[in-house]
Design a protein with these regions (language model features):
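A short helix-loop-beta-strand connector motif used in the catalytic cores of GNAT acetyltransferases and
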Residues: 50-60, 67-69, 207-210
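Conserved beta-strand in the GNAT
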Residues: 66-74, 81-86
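Conserved GNAT-fold acetyl-CoA-binding loop/helix
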Residues: 27-50, 189-190
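A short beta-loop-alpha structural element at the N-terminal edge
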Residues: 10-24, 138
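Conserved active-site alpha-helix within GNAT-family acetyltransferase domains
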Residues: 98, 121-145
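Conserved acetyl-CoA-binding loop-helix of GNAT-fold acetyltransferases
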Residues: 87, 93-106, 131
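A solvent-exposed, acidic/Ser-Thr-rich amphipathic alpha-helical stretch
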Residues: 170-222
Length: 232
């Protein structure tokens, strides 16, 4: 049993005979968004859920023994595919979805796999996934496609370093570096040897500069590549 601040939640297995209950929950969760698009159709919803229905990849989301949602998470060769993720409307906005998404992201990070999914256009789910680090990578007539790359400890350290620089928190930035770090500014070719020297250079920039972290990627050889825009 996993704990939230106020609710205990758990994942429970699904069997084939649960299909009708899952469909009813999906219809409740999607009714408003689909109606706004003029796409609410129970027959279409049934076909969509039945397509590729795999009980072994599906879990009920339970709170104190009550079923409040379900999730379909499939392990593909290249990614985790989040096919369905719904919280029953009476249980929404209680932090349950965030706790389940944390579980999904932790799995993906542990396996160094991206998470892919699609979300209905104009639904609140789009903002939810963006907050969780998903990037929009495509769109169809009715859905947006999203991808979240895995976050490793080294990626977290790189992000923490850039955030500390932006905040001018020099002790925090220094804590992200090892003593013998060497830095090369690509634009000028300038080399900076040592963590203290790198912090000193950045500390002399005037206040008001901004950092936009454009991309952080974990490379196959274990290194992390980051691309940042610095305006000063």
């Amino acid at each position: 049993m996993k704990q939230t601040a106020s609710l205990a939640w758990a994942l429970a297995p699904v069997v084939a005979s649960d299909f009708e209950a899952l469909l009813a929950l999906r219809l409740r969760a999607m009714r408003d968004s689909l109606t706004q698009l003029g796409r609410y159709d129970e027959a279409r919803a049934r076909a969509r859920l039945a397509e590729g229905f795999a009980p072994e990849s599906t879990h009920h989301i339970e709170v104190q023994g009550q079923r409040v949602g379900f999730i379909v998470l499939k392990h593909l060769s290249h990614a985790l595919r989040l096919d369905h993720f719904y919280i029953d409307p009476p249980w929404q906005n209680r932090g349950i979805g965030a706790k389940v998404m944390r579980w999904v992201c932790d799995q993906a990070d542990a396996e160094l796999l991206p998470v892919e999914l699609c979300a209905l256009k104009n639904s609140d789910a789009n903002r939810f996934y963006l907050r969780w680090g998903f990037a929009k990578v495509g769109e169809g007539e009715w859905d947006n496609d999203y991808l979240r790359m895995p976050v490793t400890p080294s990626v977290r350290a790189v992000r923490a370093f850039w955030a500390a620089l932006q905040a001018r928190d020099w002790p925090a930035a220094r804590a992200c570096l090892y003593d013998g770090v060497e830095t090369v500014w690509w634009t000028s070719g300038e080399r900076i040897a040592g963590a203290d020297a790198l912090i000193d250079v950045n500390a002399h920039y005037p206040e008001g500069w901004t950092i936009q972290l454009l991309e952080v990627e974990h490379l196959q050889d274990g290194r992390v590549m980051s691309l940042a825009r610095v305006d000063h």
